[in-house]
Amino acid sequence: MKHNDIKDLLSRPEEYFCKDVTVCGWIRSYRDSKNMAFIALNDGTTLPHLQVVIDKSVIPEMPDGATRVGSSVKIEGMAVKSLNANQAIEVNAKTVTLLGDCPLDYPIQKAKTSLDYLRTLPHLRVRTNTFNAIFRVRSKLSFAIHRFFQERGYLYVHTPIITGSDCEGAGKIFKVTTIGYDPKYKSEAEYNADDFFGQSAGLTVSGQLEGEVMATAFGKIYTFGPTFRAENSNTTRHAAEFWQIEPEVAFAEIDDIIEIATEFIKYIINAVLNECPDEINLFDKFYEKGLREKLKKVVDDEFARVDYTEAIEILKKSGKDFVYPVEWGCDLQTEHERYLTDVVYNRPVFVVNYPKDLKSFYMKQNPDGKTVAATDLLVPGVGEIIGCSEREADTEKLLQAIKDRGMKMSDYQNYLDLRKYGTVPHSGFGLGLERILMYATGMGNIRDTIIFPRAKDELR
């Protein structure tokens, strides 16, 4: 049916004053008085609602159900200047048509409902202001990511979802099979040989290895797609399925990729600030006071940089009684990351030169033989959002790293060939979309940044 988008009315009110319009949407609230009634209507095109005025001398009786929160309606009327200071335009209704009734047991009628409760209703929570705003920001953020790379000449590539190798070498892979359990198979090798691919297969944990293939032909590429990790991590920062951005750049060393990552983060955060003002206002008011200023600091301030070894010394001298003890060689936990970002630096910080045993096999070894040219970008309130590294270009060192981790050499032969035929220094990083979305919105749980979150014992 033909109708006007509420976004158009609210953003360009002068074009619609004293004109007949038709709007469709869902009732967010209904207020009644003796002679007048007021509907807050939202059609999903924008976060703010449109006020519709019902003059009871014009519409003496509303259709049954057309006053209930959640019901969908079509309203025809005239757009006029609003007396409401918060909105320039409103609609004086001439007719109201019920499109879809919403019964009284609608579970999200209350204006304020806890996030914990809404997580039990993933199919309905997107209708609330909070989740409407989250996924609007997610959309803008996604397009800003593409825009950043496209403006700089990167090739967008699609990497496989089903893979035969574990990019991270950690064994946290969801297996893909067409057989299921069958006691006739006496070994894993026999089972895999009879399966669809004739070998073990799983969902991708990263598109990086394939991304490196493309970077050796096109120079600058990026991937942006779903990633899967079978990690039994029931935390507010981990999900089994998430979207990841992974650029790969030929002829780039670690300092080059840090510079690219810095420019990238500033660009996409600035896009959110400029393109989502209503949404940021909502998050600033209800979820993280000072959010807008925090994001402006990201855009305007320099990022800090600290060597892993120095970071360990800072943590050891802090006097803090950390749950996880701090020693050189330990993996930084959330409490350590938050202390560095929130207390020591009060801004994003790159921690560089991690111990090689903490990082993936493909990262370039530093001359000291103990650390790798790798860095994590930590941000206040969230912790790690980006992992960067220069890739190991030395075939012998790469072979040894694969052996040391007990990985199957044949799975990585194509990857090793990249070093054999015209290898170059190259680097890349990975950013989880949901992590940066948490940071940009002030959300404290990654499950609130995904429409249908996937985690341990959670598949709705």
Please state what every model-predicted region is.
Residues 2-246, 250:
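Class II aminoacyl-tRNA synthetase-like tRNA-binding/catalytic domains
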Residues 12, 276-279:
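Residue-level recognition of alpha-helix termini/interfacial anchor residues
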Residues 144-152, 264-275:
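Generic non-transmembrane alpha-helical segments
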Residues 162, 172-270, 281-460:
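A translation/RNA-centric and nucleic-acid-associated enzymatic feature enriched
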